[in-house]
């Protein structure tokens, strides 16, 4: 597949691009700064400008392409975003994330791109950046859990899910096959961060409360994107993306007793089972995370 990948210069994007390339996909990185990965054409644009998005999606991306007309994209992967609150002002975070996502999905729709995969977030569940302590409505948290966040970043992601759902419905109404999958990505961890950060999480599990005690290896996130590229015909779907185990040393039953007293338990919490359910992704697209921290720390 030829993939229009936004945000490939970021923490998650760099790993995802490499996983896609290893699977044989041709990836063009769209960002504001270069990623510097070998054999990766790049276009540096402002995704909040719809004209620039449409232009980038319809032009040549590399000198090797110039013997023919610009090639269409087979898929769009949209990871670009202001990555959290408290980087700039809240309004700018919300505006940039909502506008860029609308522009990317609209361009994909108008150009007939059959698949869009976009980064949503664990924050949509309203725990991560909540004002004060907010516990999940139940655990493990699955995709049916309410999404009523307090912060501008998570609000932008909720809006982006609505945008995606609406464009997919519009395509279906027009009789067009267009799949749009949203990834509610948990805290992304690079390989070097296991030794760097996880001893502190083992010593003080409370540090992971706002992340619902979960995490996702950056390489496994790339695998999830590959799984979504390989799975057609689902229409609009959202998927939790995390590793199968928790990010703390304490057994999950103990974590629930300590931090989630009174919270209904709706699934198995044996061993170090994640509190961020990925059953849907495993069943519907074949997601099977391979990397974890327990053999390294």
Regions found by a protein language model. Give the residues of each.
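Flexible, glycine-rich beta-alpha linker
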Residues: 124-126, 152, 166, 173-199
């Amino acid at each position: 597949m030829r993939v229009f990948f936004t945000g490939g210069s970021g923490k998650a994007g760099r790993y995802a691009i490499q996983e896609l390339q290893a699977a044989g996909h041709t990836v063009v990185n769209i960002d504001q700064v270069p990623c510097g990965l070998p054999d990766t054409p790049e276009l540096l644009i402002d995704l909040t400008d719809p004209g620039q998005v449409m232009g980038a999606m319809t032009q040549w991306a590399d000198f090797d392409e110039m013997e023919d007309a610009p090639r269409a994209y087979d898929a769009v992967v949209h990871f670009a975003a202001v990555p959290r609150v408290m980087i700039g002002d809240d309004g700018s975070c919300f505006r940039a994330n909502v506008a860029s996502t609308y522009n990317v999905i609209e361009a994909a729709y108008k150009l007939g791109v059959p698949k869009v995969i976009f980064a949503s977030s664990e924050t949509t569940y309203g725990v991560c950046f909540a004002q004060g302590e907010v516990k999940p409505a139940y655990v493990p948290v699955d995709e049916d859990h309410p999404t009523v966040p307090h912060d501008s970043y998570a609000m932008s992601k909720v809006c982006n899910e609505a945008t995606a759902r609406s464009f997919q419905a519009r395509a279906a109404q027009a009789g067009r096959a267009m799949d749009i999958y949203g990834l509610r990505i948990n805290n992304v961890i690079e390989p070097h961060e296991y030794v760097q950060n996880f001893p502190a999480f083992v010593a003080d599990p409370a540090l992971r409360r706002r992340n619902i005690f979960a995490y996702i290896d950056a390489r496994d996130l790339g695998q999830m994107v590959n799984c979504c590229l390989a799975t057609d015909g689902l229409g609009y779907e959202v998927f939790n993306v995390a590793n199968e185990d928790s990010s703390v040393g304490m057994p999950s039953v103990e974590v629930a007793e300590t931090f989630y007293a009174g919270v209904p338990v709706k699934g198995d919490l044996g061993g170090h089972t994640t509190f961020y359910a990925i059953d849907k992704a495993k069943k519907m697209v074949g997601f099977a995370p391979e990397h974890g921290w327990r053999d390294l720390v």
